[in-house]
Amino acid sequence: MIYNSIYEMVNDIDPPKLPVIVPTHNNPAYLKMMLGQLDKYGLDDVIIIDNFSLYPEMRALLKEISDKYIVVSKFTNEGPREFYTNPLLFNWLPQKFIVTDPDIGFNPNLPSNLIEILEKVSEDFNLFKVGFALDIEFDGNESIKKIMPWGKTIYDWELAMYLNQIGETSSGDPIYKAPLDTTFCFVNKAYDNGDFLYTSTARVGGNFIGQHYGWYENPPIPEEEKEYLINNAGRWSSTSNGGNSG
């Protein structure tokens, strides 16, 4: 099913019990990768919110997968936080759901009951969002050691995310109180305090540490797609829209 707006979708269907929101913009290889990872964990109630992609390969993919997934193909780019900033969408979603950027690689040791674990962390610590910590020691991480517009490197910023451990999961993975944007996260509306990024969020390390391929100099996507992303500078990014956390 393809919708042309959030309004059209919310007025036509009820939300799935545990939807997975995947915001996209001209990144078909990442979306295919993410859908494969989600399928492996039985997370198939996916809602793809596409932010006005014009890349032909992306348009073709959205059409191809619309028989299996809900696709909202919008004519505007509101960025990956629209699930929160758009009251119509946020109020339509159930109390608990998942959000993930498409360029996140799952840890090969990620447990099969990851949602159960993240939900328990949310309930135990009264957290709005609980998600993956991010790997900053990957090969070629010089790409995140450059000074960014806010005066720090991504590496230094992310290193600070590992300083405040508040507990462990039942399987011994450390839980860190840290800012969290739209990397893979479990969302619990019961603990929304109006602060999207900072005060009601945590990251889980250990076997939950994921790869953020958007940081890579040579990400696992076709060269043509990489060039398209580089040459279309209008793309939304957290670093230019009020945040710099994963």
Residue spans for each PLM region:
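N-proximal low-complexity "stem/linker" segments adjacent to membrane-targeting elements
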Residues: M1-G36
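C-terminal catalytic/acceptor-binding lobe
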Residues: I2-N4, G151-G246
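Conserved short acidic donor-positioning loop in nucleotide-sugar-dependent glycosyltransferases
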Residues: N26, L38, N51-S53
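Short, acidic, metal-binding catalytic loop of nucleotide-sugar glycosyltransferases
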Residues: G36-D45
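Short beta-strand-to-loop acidic/aromatic patch adjacent to the donor-nucleotide binding site
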Residues: P94-N109
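Conserved donor-nucleotide/metal-binding helix-loop-beta segment in metal-dependent transferases, i.e.
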Residues: L110-K129
